[in-house]
C-alpha cells in the first residue's frame, strides 16, 4: 500500500521572464514502511518538493495523496489538522518552543489535538533519542544536535 503518491508535481516561482521552475513533473510513490532519500545539488528543488508534499506550500500543478487523501483538495482548516496528525516534519531551524522543556516540545503536537500523550511511547522516544536525562531542560540548555533530536521526537510522537 502506498502511503504517499506524487503525480506530475510542478512548482514555479514568479511569473513571465522571472519565472523559475523549481519542480518539473515530479512523480513517485512511497510504500508504507519504506524510506527514501531525496538528494541533489543546492537549488535543485529538494526543499521545495518537501514543502509542497508536506502541504506547507502550494503546487503550481500536479497531485499529492497522503494515506489515500488528496491533500490539495482539502479546505485549509482540515489540511492543518491533517498535516499535524499525518505528517512528521523536521524544520531546518527545528522550531522548538523556547518556554517548553524537551518533553513538552515533543508532546506539543498531541496537545494541539487535545490528545493525551502515551507516556510509555514518549519515554521510549526520549530513550531512543538519548534525551531521557534532558527531558526537563529548555531548548536553550541543549546542544544543536540535542535540539535536532527533540524535533525528531516531535515529528514521530503522533506516529505519522
Predicted segment positions?
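ABC family nucleotide-binding domain
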Residues: 2-160
Amino acid at each position: 500500500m502506498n502511503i504517499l503518491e506524487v503525480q506530475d508535481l510542478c512548482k514555479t516561482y514568479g511569473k513571465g521572464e522571472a519565472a523559475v521552475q523549481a519542480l518539473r513533473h515530479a512523480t513517485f510513490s512511497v510504500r508504507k514502511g519504506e524510506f527514501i532519500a531525496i538528494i541533489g545539488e543546492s537549488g535543485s528543488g529538494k526543499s521545495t518538493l518537501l514543502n509542497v508534499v508536506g502541504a506547507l506550500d502550494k503546487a503550481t500543478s500536479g497531485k499529492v495523496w497522503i494515506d489515500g487523501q488528496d491533500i490539495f483538495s482539502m479546505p485549509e482548516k482540515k489540511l492543518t489538522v491533517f498535516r499535524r496528525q499525518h505528517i512528521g516534519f523536521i524544520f531546518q531551524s527545528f522550531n522548538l518552543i523556547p518556554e517548553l522543556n524537551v518533553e513538552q516540545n515533543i508532546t506539543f503536537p498531541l496537545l494541539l489535538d487535545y490528545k493525551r500523550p502515551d507516556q510509555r511511547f514518549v519515554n521510549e522516544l526520549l530513550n531512543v533519542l538519548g534525551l531521557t536525562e534532558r527531558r526537563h531542560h529548555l531548548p536553550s540548555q541543549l546542544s544543536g544536535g540535542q535540539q535536532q533530536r527533540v524535533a525528531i521526537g516531535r515529528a514521530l510522537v503522533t506516529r505519522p
